[in-house]
């Protein structure tokens, strides 16, 4: 594939300062890292600057990042890594950006309409601001690329599968960062619940993704902030036939008007829903349905794994919402999941310092931990790995 460099031929690149750009569906984060060879795939990443930034326009956001780097007199980046949610059927490996890759990304935009157009706009702005630097596309789908057919193949006619219609899976960089952090403590059977404005559940066996809740697009799976999650296809057929909704209207419905926002009629923000639930029954129902959806999907992944050794909560809600963790685990009490509520409630005071907090009781039949997602660090690692060979003195 154009732009792909053999990661086994990296040579002596030494230390590289890398800017990781992470544009999500509801946030824009960035991190500046010094990646040290030869430990880039272990612990050799030094964060120099990490933050989120308002993004009125991609150009202003990138200019703001460049300004902060200059303000703090930090080392200028030598390469830029970009989180790309979906590369479509053609892009299944992290790769160095070139014109051919850009064209393939543009063609794949319909697979992730909430994410890809915004990421492409950020990429173009970054290419203008940091002209001449290599830019690397890091895909959320790569982590799930080797899922077994029983998980990957969708129950549709085979000729449609040839068009690339299959389960891709997402939040791969987040899942990979959890596996990386667990290191030697990685269990055989791991379930990761990445809960944020977008949410997914992934079953991991010996470090490999074997099933995940999102499918062809990031709209499927559990209930999310504004996304419906799994929905009877008959609902969409009914709306097309009886309400005369076209494709654009259905896309708006399932991606922007559903989920927590659609159920509550109040907000897609879980923090606001907790407040509203004190007086608004629909807000309370939205929270209940979200937690039930997550617990149900975790239970399904337990079946896939033939048991579970560790459940990890991560993402904005997973790391910060003790009530959601309590309700989800209450729905899993039948398999012996038991939380230490004191530890669970104290997570907010410790997670961002310690990154990894155990919250299960000693009697729990599986471990439960809250682990901070470090997508940006993974972007930096992959960007380092794809840099051309740099010899001393060059």
Stretches found by the model and what they are:
Residues 143-242:
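Glycine-rich phosphate-binding loop of actin/hexokinase-like ATP-binding domains
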């Amino acid at each position: 594939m154009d732009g792909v460099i053999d990661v086994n031929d990296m040579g002596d690149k030494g230390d590289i300062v890398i800017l990781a750009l992470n544009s999500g569906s509801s946030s824009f984060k960035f991190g500046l890292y010094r990646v040290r060879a030869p430990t880039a795939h272990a612990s050799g990443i030094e964060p120099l600057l990490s933050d989120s930034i308002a993004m009125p326009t991609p150009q202003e956001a990138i200019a703001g990042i460049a300004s902060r780097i200059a303000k703090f007199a930090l080392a200028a980046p030598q390469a830029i890594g970009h989180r790309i949610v979906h590369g479509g059927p053609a892009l299944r490996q992290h790769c160095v950006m070139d014109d051919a890759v850009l064209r393939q990304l543009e063609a794949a935009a319909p697979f992730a309409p909430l994410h890809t157009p915004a990421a492409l706009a950020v990429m173009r702005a970054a290419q203008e601001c940091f002209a001449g630097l290599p830019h690397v596309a890091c895909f959320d789908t790569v982590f799930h690329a080797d899922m077994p057919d029983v998980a990957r193949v969708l129950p549709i006619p085979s000729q449609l599968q040839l068009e690339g219609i299959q389960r891709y899976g997402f939040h791969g960089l987040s899942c990979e960062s959890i596996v990386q952090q667990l290191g030697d403590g990685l269990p055989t059977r791991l379930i990761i619940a990445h809960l944020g404005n977008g949410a997914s559940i992934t079953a991991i066996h010996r470090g490999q993704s074997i099933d995940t809740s999102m499918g062809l697009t990031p709209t499927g799976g559990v209930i999310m902030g504004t996304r419906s999650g799994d929905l009877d296809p008959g609902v969409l057929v009914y709306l097309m036939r009886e309400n005369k909704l076209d494709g654009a209207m259905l896309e708006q419905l399932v991606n922007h008007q559903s989920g927590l926002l659609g159920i509550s009629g109040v907000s897609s923000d879980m923090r606001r829903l907790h407040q509203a639930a004190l007086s608004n029954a629909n807000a309370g129902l939205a929270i209940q349905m979200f937690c039930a959806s997550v617990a149900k999907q975790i239970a399904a992944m337990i079946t896939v794994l033939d048991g579970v050794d560790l459940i990890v909560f991560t993402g904005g809600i997973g790391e910060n919402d003790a009530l959601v963790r309590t309700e989800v685990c209450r729905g899993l009490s039948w398999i012996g999941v038991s939380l230490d509520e004191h530890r669970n409630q104290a997570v907010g005071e410790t997670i961002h310092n310690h990154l990894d907090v155990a919250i299960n009781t000693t009697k729990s039949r599986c471990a439960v931990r809250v682990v901070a997602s470090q997508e940006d660090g993974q972007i930096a690692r992959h960007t380092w790995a794809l840099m051309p060979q740099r010899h001393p003195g060059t």
